[in-house]
Amino acid sequence: MCTSKLEEITGEWPPPALQAASTTSSSEPCRRLSPPSSKRPAGRTKFHETRHPVFRGVRRRGRAGRWVCEVRVPGRRGCRLWLGTFDAADAAARAHDAAMLALRGRAAACLNFADSAWLLAVPPPATLRCAADVQRAVARALEDFEQRESSSSVFPLAIDVVAEDAMSATSEPSAASDDDAVTSSSSTTDADEEASPFELDVVSDMGWSLYYASLAEGLLMEPPASGASSDDDDDAIVDSSDIADVSLWSY
């Protein structure tokens, strides 16, 4: 109806202008230029990423460097579960793991740490009835985990302190025994010096001049006369000694 009426009005369809436009468009490539727009583009002009690059359910809060944990409740569209603010990103990641274990169970939970499945004591999802129960279970599991971590970090330090005390206790008796040995050796040395029959203090008392004078007098003294013996061997020895004495004392 409309085309017939237009044909009756114009007598031709499509109009000549549209025909010319169609012929030019078929011969030349189509070029579309968007008109300049004075409106600002929709959306945020400045975007600051606050999500953690590695951990799930963790994002930064403020410029103080603190981290928050918030997870989505499965089966409820738009429902989120707030788990708190933490000083470290790994603590917030542990809170996320505890919440996933409480909401989905150990088999279906997507965890940040693989050891969270056995390190976090979280009750099964069937025992939790509401979001408040999940939050309390997560807080209790994180508290138990932090206590175990702190006790395990303090226990090696206590072992080191006990070992150092034992070493010091063993070194003190050895030092005392060394002192006793030195004292006993010094006392034995003093006793030996007191019991020694040769003392140079006599020489110092006499004086070196008297010592040499007595030595010279001993050299000037005549040897004692040798007695005769009935044995031939003794006579031979006496004769040889007499010869030696004559040669020695002939001066």
UniProtKB/Swiss-Prot annotation:
Q: Which UniProt keywords apply?
A: Activator, DNA-binding, Nucleus, Stress response, Transcription, Transcription regulation
Q: What does this protein do?
A: Transcriptional activator that binds specifically to the DNA sequence 5'-[AG]CCGAC-3'. Binding to the C-repeat/DRE element mediates high salinity- and dehydration-inducible transcription.
Q: Where is the stretch described as Disordered?
A: 1-50, 169-198
> Per the record's keyword annotation, is Signal included, yes or no?
no
Q: List the Gene3D superfamilies.
A: AP2/ERF domain
Write down the InterPro entries for this protein, in alphabetical order. Answer: AP2/ERF_dom, AP2/ERF_dom_sf, DNA-bd_dom_sf, DRE1A-I
Instruction: Spell out the molecular function terms from Gene Ontology.
Output: DNA binding; DNA-binding transcription factor activity
Query: Residues annotated as DNA-binding region?
Result: 54-114
In the UniProt record, which is one GO cellular component term? nucleus
* Protein name as annotated: Dehydration-responsive element-binding protein 1I
Where is this protein chiefly located? nucleus
Q: Signal peptide position in this chain?
A: none
Q: Which Pfam families does this one have?
A: AP2 (PF00847)
Q: Which family does it belong to?
A: Belongs to the AP2/ERF transcription factor family. ERF subfamily.
Q: Where in the cell is it found?
A: Nucleus
